[in-house]
Amino acid sequence: EKGRENLLLQSNQFDTTWGLEATTLTSGQTGYDGSSDAWKVIPITDNSTHYVYKTTPYQTGVSTFSVYAKYSGYHAQLRVFNIGGGKAYANFDLQNGTKGTSGGTDIIDSTITSVGNGWYRITLSLNYTIAPYSSGVIPIESPTDGEIPSYAGDGTSGVLIQDFQHEVGLVATGYIETTTAAVQKGILENLPRIDYSGGASCPSLLLEPQRTNLF
């Protein structure tokens, strides 16, 4: 298995170290995986911008952000931003499973994939060029809305979200849950495989001398 890592902490605990802007959260929603681990992000009735966000670690090069989302009165915008402006955003139509408006100075691509029962995995890929960044989900009224729109919510409708991930690379891989630290799976780059036993009771490295046949 190729090495993978979710760099975003508290990846499905949006009531911990995540920031809320003019929104409320309701936990215990039915998730894409049949669990009750999804969250409903509900815009409040103030005429404002509404989103849930988190600062992400700096990684030079290409990064991909992903989250599972479902329509519950609003569509979704994935956004990655820095002090002074957005770096990438993409809108997603959660009723029809299509991409909407997107933009930003560092955007590469976005995708939406159905996972059943009205749930979609939405992704946003971009070039990391400056630190620090924040990433988040914004409930939007229309897939054609601009970046981080302002409006007054009804206090009831929202968007369901579950399992946020930030990883290095252009493709969103299988979700890895995190709490207070990043979590790695598979064989990571620049790390040796320590899985040779040779009769030993614990994993070890097999080292052999290099030989050359001169005939």
Language-model features: locations:
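Extracellular and organelle-lumenal recognition/adhesion modules and their flexible linkers in secreted
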Residues: 1-215
